Amino acid sequence: MKKKILGLLGVFLAIWVSLPQGVFAASFQIDFDTACAAIQLINLDTGTVVYEKNPDERREPASTTKIMTYIVVYENVADPDNTKVTISEKIRDELLGTGSSLSGIQVGDVLSVTRLLHCMMIPSGNDAALALADFVGGGDVQKFVDMMNEKAEELGCTGTHFANPHGLHDDEHYTTARDLAIITQYAMMIPGFMDVCNTRSEYYTVEGGPAAGEQRLLVTTNRMIHPNLDPQYYYQYAQGIKTGSHDQAGYCLVSSAQKNGMSYLCVALGAPSVDEAGNRITEHREYNDTISLY
């Protein structure tokens, strides 16, 4: 397991160090207003920061948190395809009344770690994130969260602190657009990560427990990659990665795209999700900002 972690980290650091000097300065001026509170757009081929807005402002990341959750699970489970997790009542009970996005897993389900990663990333299941954290933490979710913070520090993040594995509101749960870009670039090197993040929908079969054999459907929350969710936000060049939202965080989106032979990563945090009266804003300007920047 240590070899697995050190290998990935070594590749990440080698790529980071090899980027040309001076590439980190923003080099592109835009002629339109952006709604998100914090943004960073990076050319992944050169490492150039193409555009940024408040990149070091602390923001709640909502469910984009799950990018780090994925990393920590991957690095601490040797055989995720064959490692099974039984969903306990405490997972269900802890999320009651939180307004969580759920993947539909049920108490008693026996699922592989790989399946739970899909349940966490595709429909943004807080239930799956919590189940994974509880399992990897040996029944101690806080231990898992500590591992998330240790990983953030290891990657060089300076404005990040996690308080949970799913992204629900907590005053001590925050990151920056710059840090989240670092975290995401690391995650993108994990084998299979981008395949999961770019999945529009998939069926799976419950492996064990009372519902063994039942087929269930997972559908992405990412409007950029699924033309049938909300066509106005579909972007043909997009390739994942993760959405997130709650009232305190606003609408958040971490995405990647390939266009004109170049690869890009955009972190967009804090688009307005409620108005001054507390009414839900239906326009997703995190998508508008991101597509306009691409």
Each language-model region and where it sits:
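Sec-dependent N-terminal signal peptides of Gram-positive bacterial secreted proteins and lipoproteins
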Residues: 2-25
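Ubiquitous "structural anchor" signal
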Residues: 15-18, 77-78, 252
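Active-site-adjacent loops and short helices of periplasmic peptidoglycan-processing enzymes
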Residues: 23-178, 187-191
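A general lysine-centric signal
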Residues: 3-4, 53, 66, 242
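Domain-terminus/edge residues, biased toward the C-terminal soluble/receptor-binding domains
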Residues: 157-158, 171-174, 178-294
